[in-house]
């Protein structure tokens, strides 16, 4: 990514609004959300590390998901807070590249990790007696490492191609972070090859994991339906309900933004949806995975005593 190939040295973030009063309100809201995100995910990681009852494959993946959410929130939110209270709305070209790269890498990694978690839930429900052997620590680590490797490799590709575009002196980003739709909107010249790369990455990082997760849940549902007792069915379903909620919220928002036809893009509407998967969902995930979780509640009570 050679900056000399572009005619801009910095970008201007429009953010959400130019109204100073609303900006202050948004600053307070995002600060509270970011604080809760840091506290919630850090606490969940600490509980998983310190309580031996949570040293299982499921919580190993949940802990890694919390770590990713900490990273994602920290990539986005500090710059959002700065944009809300500072008159200087600029971000350097290098800063935009860095934010874009790490946000894409962590997002892609989370896509793969959620797919790995779906497989973990399938094994837990379909082979409960062999769960510990089937989901060994070595296999879990391999899944996590593969998720990171895949996420960062794909991020290198999309970052390189995005910032190889020519921006033609237009450097105003109508968004609160460096994202694909507003950057492509700024670019001029040939975009056809870029759209091909974007389609490939959308397929490999989002569509394929979604298809895998859907197939996995079909097998999970088939397994649950074979359970004779109602209590057994409810218990089996409860083990994957949190993951299903997380997958639906996360992938739903990503598909809404990136899988729609370009003619239907609305940056104002997309800002709201983007806020959820970049800022709100990292705060909600610890709640989703712990509110109805007996083991996490017991570990928390033990820690607080």
UniProtKB/Swiss-Prot annotation:
GO annotation, biological process: G protein-coupled receptor signaling pathway; sensory perception of smell
Localization annotation: Cell membrane
One cellular-component annotation, GO: membrane
Transmembrane portions of the chain: 25-45, 56-76, 97-117, 139-159, 205-225, 237-257, 271-291
Presence of the UniProt keyword Transmembrane helix in the record: yes
Membrane topology: Multi-pass membrane protein
Keyword Hydrolase: no
Pfam family, one: 7tm_4
Organism domain of life: Eukaryota
Stretches in topological domain Cytoplasmic: 46-55, 118-138, 226-236, 292-305
Keywords: Cell membrane, Disulfide bond, G-protein coupled receptor, Membrane, Olfaction, Receptor, Sensory transduction, Transducer, Transmembrane, Transmembrane helix
Disulfide bonds: 96-178
All ranges on the Extracellular side of the membrane: 1-24, 77-96, 160-204, 258-270
Gene Ontology terms for molecular function: G protein-coupled receptor activity; olfactory receptor activity
SUPFAM superfamilies: Family A G protein-coupled receptor-like
Reported function: Odorant receptor.
Family (UniProt): Belongs to the G-protein coupled receptor 1 family.
Protein name as catalogued: Olfactory receptor 9G19
Organism: Mus musculus (Mouse)
